[in-house]
Amino acid sequence: YKARIDIVFSVDSISEYVEGVHFPKYLSKEVIRITKLLRSNGLSIRYNIVVTRLNQSEVRSLVLKAIDELDVNVKLLDLNKFSEYFGYSNKVSGEAAYKLWEELFISMSNFYDFLSEISNYSESEWTTQLISKGNGIPMSCYFRGNNWIQVKDSTRGAKYSEYCISNCLLYKTGNCQEGVFSLFLSSNMVLHLSGCKNTSLQYNLNGEEGWQIKRAFENLMELFK
């Protein structure tokens, strides 16, 4: 099973504080310790880095540290536009949420030259080769040694499954930017689709029997057919 899964950490900075702003998802000693332990047991690790104007100064160093020192893969993501954010201090919604997104959003194009310089080669349509019917955002990938850096650039658009188009209110109201593209089991044992906020497609597996867990996986896999 080790070859078929990634264990994902959200790591947005090297420092706990950047420009006076607290980043709870930083590369702490505990994250490093757990990363090394999992890698020593042959498990694939990925760091998800959400890039904003606040942490952009640390992104390049964080990418190199993750790959060269910790032997993990990286996924760079731009900031999704949501109607609600918890922000860096207070919960904001509506117009305030949109203004926060405008203030923090930074295009992934700012990092393409850097990624080209540090990589051996790249593929612009990497993820669409791995996903049934090419759903989701077409993500590019840059390879460095044995590891890779995947880039989610929302400006490239997304391909949505028939389920999204026909049944999902988030899609119909323009509040989904990613569509259906991969299964994700969170640390709280909730099985869902990566990037998907549709609660009807979330399964709490805590205390479930084996047949119930299997059925949850099968139900979500149906969306890829």
Identify the residue ranges that each predicted region occupies:
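Structured loop/turn residues at beta-strand edges in well-structured enzyme cores
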Residues: 2-3, 69, 178
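Radical SAM enzyme [4Fe-4S]-AdoMet core and its adjacent flexible, acidic
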Residues: 17-166
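Flexible mid-to-C-terminal extensions adjoining Fe-S/redox cofactors in radical SAM and related proteins
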Residues: 159-225
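Conserved SAM/AdoMet-binding glycine-rich loop
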Residues: 1-17, 33
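A structural signal for short, well-ordered beta-strand segments
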Residues: 7-9, 47, 195
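Short coil/turn linker and secondary-structure boundary residues
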Residues: 14, 26, 106, 196, ...
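Short, surface-exposed linear patches
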Residues: 7, 28-33, 172, 206-207
